[in-house]
UniProtKB/Swiss-Prot annotation:
Primary residence: cytoplasm
Organism: Klebsiella pneumoniae (strain 342)
Organism taxonomic ancestry: Bacteria, Pseudomonadati, Pseudomonadota, Gammaproteobacteria, Enterobacterales
Pathway assigned in UniProt: Amino-acid degradation; L-threonine degradation via oxydo-reductase pathway; glycine from L-threonine: step 1/2
Keyword Amino-acid biosynthesis appears in the UniProt entry: no
Example of a GO MF term: zinc ion binding
Chloroplast as UniProt keyword: no
Residues bound to Zn(2+) 2: C93, C96, C99, C107
Gene3D superfamilies linked to this entry: Medium-chain alcohol dehydrogenases, catalytic domain, NAD(P)-binding Rossmann-like Domain
Gene: tdh
SMART domains: PKS_ER (SM00829)
Name recorded for this polypeptide: L-threonine 3-dehydrogenase
EC code: 1.1.1.103
């Protein structure tokens, strides 16, 4: 079958021909319809330090997808041929304390689809049926293909009560923009997003944020004054991994504020911990999605009117995958969707 693989320990992704995956007793075989390119896939393409330590070569990559069930393991119940599905890309052990307690998103033995095992950038994918999620008929293939990153946004944004709150989102990448849209949709008062990339700030404006702030040109404190905010932000969603953005968030949080961190900062990032202590801030780390509460919330948010369509800015057939990666690497894109049909 046709697949996109990391073939060499160098920059690039290559179109390859690989055997179709075998279906285990508890697995589903999925014929892929659409896939989306994640920032993780760009890291793998670039072959950065993290990728060199993490990714086995050669391997089929990718973990954002929607497809159709075409094969079912003999122990699987609850699925039928033709079901349209996406799936949780974190495969968990089922045996550790967190898994047994129902906190599977905190499994210490998590394996990533397209990271530690073959991924979805292929004509067919096998995953455990436990990880599959049926897509409602009124959600398009394009939107279903970005459920994985949308789930990161939903998990981060809904970590805290947002109704009536002032929310700061640092980082206007696709996940940050989707998190901002979720916050606004569920009843936040002011949702302010910051970045230095004007293309992505304009995407955030299309998604309905209160203010999209280019911090290279505007002062965040001036924006707060413009909005009549006198006590700081109640909730911070750190999506950038950029130390200056996180320090600015600490400066502008209200006392008792709550911060959810999805962005991955440098391991040696320094901050003024006295601000965390004396402001009584709560900081929560986010990894992936809650299984499977986040998935149900994603479907419900879209079905209740949240419009994510502006975040998908580029669409290509799979034979033009290089154009998709070029768009992602340029920084002048939202989500990029590749069609396998």
């Amino acid at each position: 079958m046709k697949a996109l693989s990391k073939l060499k320990a160098e920059e690039g992704i290559w179109m390859t021909d690989v055997p179709e995956p075998e279906v285990g007793h508890n697995d589903l075989l999925i014929k892929i319809r659409k896939t989306a390119i994640c920032g993780t896939d760009v890291h793998i393409y670039n072959w950065d330090e993290w990728s060199q330590k993490t990714i086995p070569v050669p391997m089929v990559v990718g973990h954002e997808y929607v497809g159709e069930v075409v094969g079912i393991g003999q122990e699987v119940r609850g699925f039928k041929i033709g079901d349209r599905v996406s799936g949780e890309g974190h495969i968990t052990c089922g045996h550790c304390r967190n898994c047994r307690a129902g906190r599977t998103h905190l499994c210490r033995n998590t394996i990533g689809v397209g990271v530690n095992r073959p991924g979805c950038f292929a004509e067919y994918l096998v995953i455990p049926a436990f990880n599959a999620f049926k897509i409602p008929d009124n959600i398009s293939d394009d939107l279903a293909s970005i459920f994985d990153p949308f789930g990161n946004a939903v998990h981060t944004a809904l970590s805290f009560d947002l109704v009536g709150e002032d929310v700061l989102v640092s980082g206007a990448g696709p996940i940050g923009v989707m998190a901002a849209a979720v916050a606004k949709h569920v009843g936040a008062r002011n949702v302010v997003i910051t970045d230095v990339n004007e293309y992505r700030l304009e995407l955030a404006r299309k998604m309905g944020v209160t203010r999209a702030v280019n911090v290279a040109k505007e002062n965040l404190n001036d924006v707060m004054a413009e909005l009549g905010m006198t006590e700081g932000f109640d909730v911070g969603l750190e999506m950038s991994g950029a130390p200056p953005a996180f320090r600015s968030m600490l400066d502008t949080m209200n006392h008792g504020g709550r911060i959810a961190m999805l962005g991955i900062p440098p391991s040696d990032m320094s901050i003024d911990w006295t601000k965390v202590i004396f402001k009584g801030l709560f900081i929560k780390g986010i990894y992936g999605r809650e299984m499977f509460e986040t998935w149900y919330k994603m479907a419900a948010l879209i079905q209740s009117g949240l419009d994510l369509s502006p975040i998908i800015t580029h669409r290509f057939g799979i034979d033009d995958f290089q154009k998709g990666f070029d768009a992602m690497r340029s920084g002048q894109s939202g989500k990029v969707v590749l069609s396998w049909e």
